């Protein structure tokens, strides 16, 4: 009775996120508005928003398989240890199963959503390496057609932003909380006239954000050959 309260020291560490400032500005002359059938302002604003989205994608992809910084001062570098060597093949079902197994062996909670970022070529590879008689064929075909976006427990995200080293494309399989995006300043948009530019309309977007890999056990690099 009345024993001491047990003290449990849960191991933890901090990760450093270096914020990067992004700006986008473009001018639309009044003459352009006259020459075009529609007001181009909304198209320019949409292009700026897409540019900011691509910048966020690049930060996340770079952080996923790059060097993470941890420790009290954020100066200790940590490399990603989970890497599936590509051999001489593109993306195969065997590689997807290995990525899933890697996360499972690392005791990643299966209730946490899992994603995999691949390129268009990897979807084609999956379809080409799956036999028509295989039970996986119809699922992969539906994936290639965009009818579904999930296979083997992964939500598929198709991107052209993945790095290519020679003929090797680095795809990324990860649990959702394995990568964090830090936003210092959310996306701000302004559309104003510039008196100093002949009263041209300026579309301006800015933001400040960065990303880091939170846990190595929750991120797997899947290397795929592209010929």
Positions of predicted regions on the chain:
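Generic structural signal of hydrophobic/aromatic residues within well-ordered alpha-helices
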Residues: 60-64, 99, 123-126, 222
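Long, contiguous amphipathic alpha-helices that act as assembly "spine/axial" helices in icosahedral shell
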Residues: 11-72, 104-120, 156, 189-213
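Extended, solvent-exposed, turn-rich assembly/linker loops in the middle of proteins
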Residues: 70-142
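Generic signal for short, ordered secondary-structure residues
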Residues: 26-27, 78, 182
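Sequence/fold signature of self-assembling virion shell proteins
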Residues: 3-6, 10-18, 35, 84-91, ...
């Amino acid at each position: 009775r009345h024993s001491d309260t047990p003290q449990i020291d849960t191991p933890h560490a901090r990760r450093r996120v270096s914020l990067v400032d992004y700006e986008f500005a473009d001018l639309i002359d009044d003459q352009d508005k006259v020459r075009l059938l529609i007001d181009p302002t909304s198209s320019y604003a949409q292009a700026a928003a897409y540019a900011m989205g691509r910048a966020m994608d690049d930060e996340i992809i770079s952080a996923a398989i790059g060097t993470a910084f941890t420790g009290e001062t954020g100066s200790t570098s940590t490399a990603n240890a989970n890497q599936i060597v590509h051999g001489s093949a593109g993306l195969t079902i065997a590689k997807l199963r290995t990525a899933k197994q890697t996360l499972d062996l690392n005791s990643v909670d299966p209730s946490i959503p899992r994603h995999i970022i691949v390129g268009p070529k990897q979807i084609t590879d999956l379809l080409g390496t799956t036999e028509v008689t295989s039970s996986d064929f119809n699922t992969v075909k539906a994936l290639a057609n965009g009818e579904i976006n999930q296979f083997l427990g992964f939500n598929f995200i198709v991107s052209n932003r993945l790095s290519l080293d020679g003929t090797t494309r680095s795809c990324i399989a990860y649990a959702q909380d394995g990568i964090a995006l830090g936003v210092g300043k959310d996306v701000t948009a302004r559309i104003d006239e510039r008196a100093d530019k002949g009263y041209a309309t300026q579309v301006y977007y800015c933001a400040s954000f960065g990303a880091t890999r939170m846990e190595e056990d929750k991120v797997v690099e899947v290397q795929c050959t592209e010929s």
